[in-house]
Amino acid sequence: MVNSGNVVISSGGGGIPVIEKNSSLEGIAAVIDKDKSCALLAASLNADILLILTAVDFVYIDFNTENQRALTKISAGEALRYRNSGHFAKGSMLPKIDACLDFINKNPKGHAVITSLNMAKDALDGSVGTIIYNKNEVI
């Protein structure tokens, strides 16, 4: 499907973690980080774009305050600075930012986009969403 030029959605929540035990599979208690798993898969495929969908159209700093500001295009270094300054909530935007940074670190020619499901198509052409790129990449 990838070789045919299709957009492949291949990582998400809802799976049941299993281990092999005595030649059979056994369910175990574990958390599957869908942001991290999709970033690892995209990097292993050397994907051009990692698209992460969420409830908002952009990543924001100072989220839910009067100073809230949408980030449209930022370097991985800027994203890391905002991350380390505490701008992204654990269990919400933080794992998405971490996944994007991991993807770019493993695939420096690729870039990541975070946006809402409704804006996914437009985000792929760069007209909406937050684009996170390697500072050496030309977008």
Model-predicted regions and their roles:
Residues 1-139:
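C-terminal catalytic "cap/lid" subdomain
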